[in-house]
Amino acid sequence: MRLNMLIYLIVACCWGKSLSIPQQILNEFKSTLLPLFGLKEQPKIEGKVQVPEALKKIYNIQNNFEYDTASLPLPGLYTKSANTIRSFTHVESPIDEKFVHPHRFRLKFNISSIPRHEKLTAAEIKLTRETAKNTSHPFQRVLVHDILQPGVKGLHGPITRVIDSKVVDSRKNTTVSIDVFPAVARWMQDPKTNHGILIVVYSIGAKKSPPEKHLRLRRDTAPPQWYQHQPLLFTYTDDGKNQQRTGTELTKMRPKRQSSRRHRKNLKDPCRRRQMYVDFGSVGWNDWIVAPLGYDAYYCGGECEYPIPDHMNTTNHAIVQSLVNSMKPKEVPGPCCVPTQLGQMSMLYLGSDGSVILKNYKEMVVVGCGCR
């Protein structure tokens, strides 16, 4: 973490909430942190954006995760290298009116906000459903078509390929997840090929159509209810900034506590981790950052005098430097109190395009300090 960023973080965070922060400090704070978060500018939010419960759940899981890792703790479909999740809603258009049947519908998602350099590791569409009652044929097949080429009126229908197929029980109301990785990967390579996804639902063993309101494919309710039931596209990407770490590196280190306790009284202000809270609301970011509203970043401060106790998590070079400093204080400076381990921070925020992003950022929290 760069020194100038720490300086402005400390200045901004130590400012009382009742006091106004000078505009110059605000500008420095924003210009330093936005690139750190992978953003070119502050998102501009228009209208109400509903945060999916699935992202809230993953955010809470990540914050309570046993290990300190920037990879998202997701099993199965999602690879461990993914450190960013984005959710997208269907882009409504006049084409929607052409799909009059409730069990055949085209979903279109604008994923242009995903940076081209990020690696796609998985993509899924989640569909909510209501329990169907009094049905003699409860099982349905959900066919997912990638639209390779849209149809031409009077000539031919759309050219598609099936990329996923699911059999679901209409007596259950659990969320249905369909894999759309091949389609989204192609869209990222060539945005012009994004013609959407065609979803068709059939009843298995029955001539009549499936229950009309089982799978929720299109808007048919008031906005508050639709926000909770609308289809959502989730993309899982890796921006390449988080290297895979070993189990030893992921576990939080505990300082050694040996016979060095007797040396503590010799240090007037020993090297240790100190409080530093970053308040996003103080710089006006609470309109696009959903969570956290702020976080404990901490910093390292204090003296590293000779002899350096074992619990200071030092190095052999620092021990030698402190020894020489004790003999020649004017010629050689003493070791510095610096972070020896940094942890990740999860952030849930809104994009200017209406998307919701959950991203993990490494090296944002001081976990341990030492003399180096």
Curated annotation (Swiss-Prot):
Identify the Pfam families for this entry: TGF_beta, TGFb_propeptide
Cysteine pairings via disulfide bonds:
C271-C337, C300-C369, C304-C371
Query: What's a single GO BP term from this record?
Result: cell differentiation
According to the record, glycans are attached at: N110, N134, N173, N313
Q: Which residues form the signal peptide?
A: 1-20
Looking up SMART domains in the UniProt record yields:
TGFB (SM00204)
Cite a single GO MF annotation.
Answer: growth factor activity
Q: What is its main location?
A: secreted
The record ties this protein, via InterPro entries, to:
Cystine-knot_cytokine, TGF-b_C, TGF-b_propeptide, TGF-beta-rel, TGFb_CS
Q: Where in the cell is it found?
A: Secreted
UniProt GO cellular component terms: extracellular region
> What keywords is this UniProt entry annotated with?
Developmental protein, Differentiation, Disulfide bond, Glycoprotein, Growth factor, Secreted, Signal
Q: Where is the composition biased (Basic residues)?
A: 253-266
- Annotated region described as Disordered, given as residue ranges: 237-267
Q: Which domain of life is it from?
A: Eukaryota
Q: How does it assemble?
A: Homodimer or heterodimer; disulfide-linked.
Summarizing the function annotation, the protein's role is: Acts as an extracellular morphogen to establish at least two cellular response thresholds within the dorsal half of the drosophila embryo. Required for the proper development of the embryonic dorsal hypoderm, for viability of larvae and for cell viability of the epithelial cells in the imaginal disks. Acts together with scw.
The UniProt similarity line reads:
Belongs to the TGF-beta family.
Name recorded for this polypeptide = Protein decapentaplegic
Q: What is the protein's species of origin?
A: Tribolium castaneum (Red flour beetle)
